[in-house]
Amino acid sequence: MLSIQIYTIREHTKTYEDALNALKKLKDLGYNSVQLAGNIEKLEYTAKAAKEVGLEVIGVLSNLVTVEENQDKLFEIMRYSGATDIGISADEVGDDAVEMIKRANAFCKIANANGFTFSYHNHSHEFIRGESGKRAIDYIIESFDGDLMPDTYWLQHGGVDVIKFIEDNAKKIKILHLKDMQRTVDGVTFSELGKGNMNIKGIIEKAKELGISNLVVEQDVCQGDSLKSAEISIDYLKGAL
């Protein structure tokens, strides 16, 4: 599955018409599926655009408040698009992860009852140790009833051995975000796959070995036009798969 998280090209998806044109370009580049992102309105019109151009929707990514407050509409969008996974990410949680997980588990039960999987997408703040000495990711791995949706860049940014994390948690991973990290004179930034310093090839090989088939290209910040970045990344991915 050659997938992309359309947050990557968000400047090209501000309206339905723009999204339609951008998703057509993604399909022409060789992508055959997408993961949607945004508020409920954006999820709705990008789902419509994806269906119009013939791109499979593997899932959506939003936040806990949005999915809690728009449950019925979200499930409608999921069924319309054929998507199967609902993902959330969170702002910094720290030791407050316990309360967040309680709410997430309540929604997970509802999502599962409606035929959908529910996943947590990490950034790097989950790897900061709180006053208890534990990291938010420890609470999430131990207590979250849903799946994990790891992000390779943010795992690396959090000081984690990316391949080991994927290996240790493989049973809970259905979707993996592929994102490269580039070193600059000012620190680190996002880059197209294969243009950074991460072992993306090794990560892909490990994912294949573990049966993780939903590999999703994502780039939070692009130095040039994001559609060009999407092209560079899929060309790399085609060669690596």
What are these regions (language model features)?
Residues E17-N21, Q71-K73, E99-N105, E131-D138, ...:
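Charged helix-capping and loop-helix junction motifs
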Residues A113-N197:
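Acidic/histidine-rich catalytic cores of soluble enzymes
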Residues E11-Y16, S33-T46, N63-N70, D91-V98, ...:
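Acidic-and-aromatic substrate-binding clefts and catalytic sites of carbohydrate-active enzymes
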Residues G224-L241:
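C-terminal helical cap(s) of enzyme catalytic domains, especially alpha/beta-barrels
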Residues M1-Y80, T84:
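N-terminal pre-domain/capping segments
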Residues E44-L61, F107, A111-F116, E231-D235:
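Short acidic, glycine/proline-enriched helix-loop-strand junctions
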Residues G30, G54-E56, Y80-D85, S143-L148, ...:
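Glycine-enriched alpha-helix->loop->beta-strand junction motifs that scaffold or abut catalytic
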Residues L2-I6, V34-L36, V57-S62, I86-I88, ...:
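Hydrophobic faces of well-ordered beta-strands that scaffold small-molecule active sites
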